[in-house]
Amino acid sequence: MISCGEASGDLYAGALVDALREIDPGVEVFGFGGERLRAAGADLIGDYRGFSVTGLSEALPVLSRSWKMLNALREAARTRRPDVFVAVDFPDFNFRLLPAMRALGVKVVYYVSPQLWAWRPARLETIRRYVDRMLVIFPFEKALYERAGVPVEFVGHPLVDLARAGQPRDAFLRANKLDPARPVLALLPGSRPSELRHVLPGLAAAAPLVAARVPGVQFLVARAPALDDGLFAPLDAVRAAGLPVAIVTGATDDVLASADAVVTASGTATVQAALHGAPMVIVYRLSAFTYAVGRRFVRVSSYGMVNLVAGRLIVPELIQDQFTPEAVAAEAASLLTDRARAEAMRRDLATVRATLGSPGASRRAARALGTGDFSTDRAMKEPEVGRANDRPTSGS
């Protein structure tokens, strides 16, 4: 049984199931996820879309549906009795399934750690109580769980395998009616509806300011699947100003590989951009209520994962009140015009890529599940995936 939420979790879960089927073609997989997990052959009891939100106030409208889905998954586990339950990130949902799995005697593996090092560290006790093994994708997470006495394995980041462009840059840009000879700024506003509502208006307002600083600039927008067209209405004003804008669905890697610089919402996309060596600016905004509450609990000095992995601020971050159209335009224009700065950032991003492990993360995770041995943190018979450096906070 497997449970994931959000586009990134669905991507990782689907790749994991593909790798499991290479080991055991007859493996039965069911649970909660999205189209990528379904494409891997999982029997989905529910689809995560509509459950994934950011923030406290944003979560209230989905609580009733979440409880119904949790009950359906608990009942499915009681009926079908899986050997292993794999939780993929999505802790606000998945943590509520852990006690039921323990009561049924189902082994629990958590693949892709919740960000305990950033906030809500009390969740570590829940993991220690209910989880048989953690499979982590960032090197500094291994040391955190080892200190807590939780069996853990660093398998590497699945995006090392998955972050691949499908088309040559020039062909991709021409297919989307953009000129390969002109500068391209990619905009990645997030994958959740709540993120787009908070982030995309600011990016749209910044676009004409970037154009005023960088003549000929074009805008390439990465759109996550299954998002409503109305969420992208802020871009209508950009088009009305005569600026070239292409919105591309389900091709984030091609967008990143084609861009000269990127403005991205904080999250998985920052790692994806790093793997493509794309100079970037990280932005984020929450509701005022959620941000005010969250500031009291956040324990890190950076929001962007690339900065946390690097242990220092290698990519600029514009968060909440700092996220203004003027600030975005200044940073983006600098990356598009200052070649020395952009190249220095690419070198820093290469050091981040080197810590994320060798190819084969999904295969290593699948083999960890396939052993059935959850008592020790055994060494995988795979190439080294990188040294687990202890960097829970930026600048530490």
Regions found by a protein language model. Give the residues of each.
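Nucleotide-activated sugar donor-binding and catalytic core shared by glycosyltransferases
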Residues: M1-S396
